[in-house]
């Protein structure tokens, strides 16, 4: 295990020249950070100075508390701090707080960057002794509803939650490629070849490399806890890979008669193909990460990605095939009548003023839906014995509430997606108030960025300013292009880059 010391910095000059520089992450422990938009803190030293620098450390302490609660959740009840070393000697996986915090400016206000909880990412060590593997993550954790003492299993070894799911996702292409492909300068229509010929972007590969290891850490801890308790509980990992969410762009072009329905359908095919290729690569990266951590039994977990042929996608395609305009009302009605009833239950929780008025807004709301979908699925409840029914009749409402099934969703994502999960938390709060629905809780975990734009001066996101199809050079080496895999190699290691290259080629993507 090595502490990351580099951040990739995409420099976009006034003359539109592009270069990538690898910056060493500065270590600061004073109150003045010279305007730096990213740096590292030694948390032990900083927390000792808490009284002298209370404003500086108020949110650092809150961030640390979030990490402590994640520690309590994932570690077994008996693995309290004093016995972590004993647990490791026994071969049990253990999560420990590290000694540093990464501070990356994520906010859009004038406050100093060290005075906002959104900016602090705590170092966390995941140790898997049986696999002789240790991983270091910089995570930021948000909670709502769960009690501080909640763990995956009780001291008696009973699962606290009837279901545990991990959710994540990755954006396809980048904003520039998607925009260029729908504004072809030659025809004014769409440029399908631009999408088809696009190599994997900086944003796609950086995120998969960054998030897959964090997902594997959290997932492996869950799986190993289930094995220790012999609970038979199977972890579910769901990756939300967009597809039809992007279709509104070309649908608008078709409505304005700037392209034919054939071109639109070909553009949709290119997006769907990318959905499959990037999704397959992401799945393989997580599987490999689990194997590194000693998880070789694939029956202990299920991993999959969202479908690109759901109701909304089919209706949009069908309308375009018949040279018609996709109808939002028709799509909503079809979603509402789906057999499993999940969307119907979800949509009932959305205030009328927050409901979508176009396909773009529907696509965004669908991200929220997928994030909490595990809470919406209905499971057949076991029929209680007659004696149990008698006991249940005598229980108080408070006691009944405690006996409700509980489900846990852990998100592992980029902090750029925070709005999705914040909105998901609001819906889950409503669901928990319904007596007939399981109590579902969402633990938000955000992985720290390692690829910044212009020193993070404007907090710009790589997904929006990813330079492809243009290729930057390495700063100071004007004839050395820095391809996406080159950046992965520099930030995450040669093995990570080689594995990604192999999985991408197996998925049919040229790199």
Swiss-Prot record:
Could you tell me the keywords of this UniProt record?
Ligase
Listed EC numbers: 6.3.2.-
Q: Name one GO molecular function term.
A: ligase activity
Q: In which pathway does it act?
A: Secondary metabolite biosynthesis
Q: Annotated motif Conserved DDXXE motif: location in the chain?
A: 413-417
Reactions it catalyzes: L-arginyl-tRNA(Arg) + L-leucyl-tRNA(Leu) = cyclo(L-arginyl-L-leucyl) + tRNA(Arg) + tRNA(Leu) + 2 H(+)
Name of this chain's protein:
Arginine-containing cyclodipeptide synthase eshA
Is Ligase included in the keywords of this UniProt record? yes
Organism this protein belongs to = Penicillium shearii (Eupenicillium shearii)
Q: Which family does it belong to?
A: Belongs to the arginine-containing cyclodipeptide synthase family.
State the domain notes. The conserved DDXXE motif is essential for catalytic activity.
Q: What does this protein do?
A: Arginine-containing cyclodipeptide synthase; part of the cluster that mediates the biosynthesis of a highly modified cyclo-arginine-leucine dipeptide (cRW). Within the pathway, eshA acts as the scaffold-generating enzyme and is responsible for formation of the cyclo-Arg-Leu diketopiperazine (cRL) from L-arginyl-tRNA(Arg) + L-Leucyl-tRNA(Leu). Additional enzymes from the cluster then further modify the cyclo-Arg-Leu diketopiperazine (cRW) scaffold.
Enzyme class (EC, first level)? ligase
